[in-house]
Amino acid sequence: VKNQNPFGTCWAFGMAAIMETSLLAQNKGTYDLSEEHLSYFFSNRQNDPLGNTPDDKNYVLGNYHETGGNDHLAAIYLSTWAGMTTEADVPFPTDSSHQNDLTVQIPESKAYNSAAYLKNASVSKYSEERMKEMLLNDHAVSIMLYMKESYVNPDTAAYCYPVGKSNSTVINHIVTVVGWDDTYSKDNFLPVSNVTSDGAWIIKNSWGEKKGDGGYYYLSYQDPNINKLVSAEAVAVSDQKYRNNYFYDGSSALSVIPIQAGQSVAAVYETTAGKGKAEVLGEVNLVTNSDNACYKIQIYTDLTDPYDPESGTAAYAAPYEFEQPIAGVQTISVPEVVLKQGSRYSVVITNSGIDKISFGVEAKSSYGNWFTCTAGIETGQTFYKSASETARWTDGKTKNWTARIKAHTRTLNQSWVPDTPVFQVKAYNSGYNLISWEKVSGVTGYYVYRKPAAGGKWSKIADVGTSELKYKDSKVTANASYRYTVKAYYEASGKRYSGKYKTGDVIKAAPAVQKVTSVKSEKNGIRIRWKPQKKCDGYYIYRKKKGGSYQLIKKISNGNSSSYLDKKAQKGVSYYYA
C-alpha cells in the first residue's frame, strides 16, 4: 500500500496498482512503478520515438500534482508506451515525512522510459457482475468514487457513501478493487451509510498503511458513486516481442466516431523504425467504447498510393477476425507480416458485426476547467470508408480526427530480402542474348549481371524497372560463352536492397551473321566461300531458287571450314546461297 500524500494523484496510483497487480499475477515478481513518471509526462507529453506525434499534447490546467485525472485517460496515454517506468527511475517527489520535494527536474529524455507496457485495458460502467468479471480477468480494477473519512467505520474499515443522499454521482477519488466478499455483513457499515444488503469489495487505497485496515477497506456493493471501472493487462518490457510502436494518436482525449456495420477505418505508416533493416508486424492496437465489438483486420504492404490504404498487397488471404468483449484499449495479435524499410503499409479495420462501434479517435478536446488536448492531425495518416462497394477512402483530416490504430513491429537482423527471380537466357544470331525473368512482387526493379563462363567477376550490365521483365544484351562477342544472373531489389529511404541470386547455366552467344564472300561455278558444281569465325562449331549451308525459299542442304561440323562445293546444283539454274 502506497501513500499519495501530499498530492492529488490518486489516479496515477490507481493505474500503477492495476499494472503492478497484473504483473504479479503473471508471476513476474513485485514491481514498484512510478506514479510520478505517469502524472508528470501525462501533462508534459513528448514526441514519440518514431517522431510521428510532435504536436499532440495533453494540458492539465494548473498544478499536475493537484488537478486530478482518471484511469480511462491514463490507459489511452499508456497505449503510447510512455511508461510505466520504475519508482527507482523516477521517484515520488516527497521526503520521508511526505513533505513535497520538487527540486529535482525530470529529464524529458525519460519520457518513454518503461519497465512495463500497457497491453490491454478494459473500461466499463459499474455493475456487480461486470466488476467480478474484470477482477477474474485482470485481478484488480481501478474505480472512481467519493471518499470521505467520516463515512468510514473505524472498527471495521467498512466504507459506503450514504445511499440515497444524492440524486447524482459525485467523484473525488480513485481506489483499486482487489477482491470481494459476498457475505460481508451490512452491519459493518456505519448506520449513516444506509446499507441494506450484504456484500463488499475489498479495496486498496493510496493513503498509506495507517489508514483503514493496513491501507485496505471494505466498500459496499451499494455505494452510489462507484463509477468508471478500469482494469489492465500489463507486459514486462523484457517480454514484449514487438518493440516498435507506430501511432499518430499521441494525446489522450476520449473522443469517438460511429463505425457502422461494414464500415472501415485505416492507418497508413511508413516503415522507418528498422533504420535500414526489415520489420515484422505482429500486433495491432485500437481503442473502442463498445462492448462485443467485432473486427476484420487486413494489412496491406507496399502501398502505391499513400492516400489509398488498399492500394498495396493484402497480407492475408482472408482478413483476420477478432472480437473485443469489453470496451477499452485492445492489443490484437495478428499473423506476422514482413515490412520493407521505407515502404508504406496500412492497417485496415472493418466492423464485421451487426452493431455500431464507437471507435476511439484523437481530436482536439476540452474537459471542463481541468484538462484539454490538442491533436496534430496531418493528411495521409488515418482514413475511413463507408460500407458501399463503390465507396472511396476519406482522409480523417477532413473531419479533424485521427483514428486510434497502432501497429507494433519488431526489427529483423537484416533487410527484407526479395525473392530470387526465375530467369532464362536465349542466344539470337542477330548478335544479342535475351535474358527474361518472372515477376517478383514488392520490388522496385531488377539488376542483370554477366560474367565469362570460364570465370571472372560479375559485371552489372543493366538496371531494369518493374515495367520490363527482359533485357537484350547486345554487347556480346559472337560464339563467346557467358553466365548470367538476375537480382530483384527494392528502394527505401534513398537506399537499395537486393535479394539473393542464382547463377544461370553457360550459354554461348550466337555467331555473327555469316557473310558469303564468293559463289563460283566449278567443274563438279558450285563453290561457296566464306571467312571462318573464331570459336565457331560449324556452319549450315542454305540454298534457294529465284522466287523460292531457303532450304538446308548441308551441315558442316568443322568450325575452321571456309568453303563448300554444291555438287547437286543443276546446270542452267540460278541459285542463291546463305
Label each PLM-derived region with a short phrase.
Residues 467-472, 560-564:
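Short S/T/G- and acidic-enriched coil/turn segments that sit immediately N-terminal to beta-strands
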Residues 413-442, 478, 493-535, 571:
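Pro/Thr/Ser/Gly-rich low-complexity, intrinsically disordered linker/stalk tracts
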Residues 349-414, 500-504:
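Short, surface-exposed beta-strand/loop patches at domain edges
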Residues 201, 295-297, 446-448, 539-541, ...:
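Short beta-strand elements bearing conserved aromatic residues within extracellular beta-rich modules
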Residues 442-460, 535-553:
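Extracellular low-complexity, O-glycosylation-prone stalks/linkers
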Residues 5-6, 11-20, 37-200, 204-291, ...:
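Predominantly the structural core of cysteine protease catalytic domains
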Residues 473-494, 566-578:
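Beta-strand-rich modules
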